[in-house]
Amino acid sequence: MQADLDAFLDHLRNERQVSQHTLDGYRRDLAKVHAHCEREGLDAWSALDAGRLRRLIARLHLQGHSSRSLARLLSALRGFYRYLLREGRCRHDPAAGLSPPKGERRLPRTLDADRTQQLLDGAVEDDFIARRDQAMLELFYSSGLRLSELVGLDLDRLDLAAGLVRVHGKGNKARDLPIGSKAREALRAWLSLRAQARPADGALFVGRTGRRLTPRAVQLRVRQAGVRELGQHLHPHMLRHSFASHLLESSQDLRAVQELLGHADIATTQIYTHLDFQHLAAVYDQAHPRARRRKDDTS
């Protein structure tokens, strides 16, 4: 069974050219299913049936796994079985028709526009690390990049004269994104210092040793910036969420936001309409004469 898993992961890496982040997710999810099969005494993927798979999903749900993580596991398993079916390794997909337990969909956390400006307008020293980190923060928010997209950027994907950056998202799909003027300024300042590290390749964001930054290193730098400027922990995806929410709030163009984020399904983008409604509801509560509570209203 492990040989089939390894062959599938090689297929994803070499044929589908998925990102390392996506590959690691498939590996973790499928390892859980593999361990369950071993507990059930199964020695082939063709022996896994829907009943056994339901027991696994129920057990993981009771252990606290979210509906979203279980949906991702089932999606990974369906992809794996499509591969096995094509290779003639089995004749059925036990995950077909199975759905994870329903759960509330959490709204993504965002910064409001003022807090975002406070983060990005903090004092920046003219040194290697500070300029690099500022460029990363500006680019995350300016173009709504995923963490994996920013880490994977090379110099030749950047066209500052045209104000564009080409990123490769999920499924290695390329999209060209605009870069705002503040982000362009920050990138130019960073590029003036980047050569100090003597980079070994064309990676846009590197450490002092010249090597491409890892996702973990970028997460740490964003978190430290959040604590320093805002007194709170930040994650790179929070800047992507803020980009989407602020853009939708200003433009009301859901399709454009979908294209910029690289979402295959507009339903994924629609989560930001709930954030926009929250903003409008807050404005209504503060401004509408029939919505404001009187100070002496204790009912």
UniProtKB/Swiss-Prot annotation:
The keyword Cell cycle applies. The active site is at 146, 170, 237, 240, 263, 272 (o-(3'-phospho-dna)-tyrosine intermediate). Its main location: cytoplasm. InterPro entries: CB (IPR044068), DNA_brk_join_enz (IPR011010), Integrase-like_cat_sf (IPR013762), Integrase_catalytic (IPR002104), Integrase_recombinase_N (IPR010998), Integrase_SAM-like_N (IPR004107), Recomb_XerC (IPR011931), Tyrosine_recombinase_XerC/XerD (IPR023009). The keyword Thylakoid does not apply. One of its GO terms (biological process) is cell division. Forms a cyclic heterotetrameric complex composed of two molecules of XerC and two molecules of XerD. Belongs to the 'phage' integrase family. XerC subfamily. HAMAP family: Recomb_XerC_XerD. This is Tyrosine recombinase XerC. It comes from Azotobacter vinelandii (strain DJ / ATCC BAA-1303).
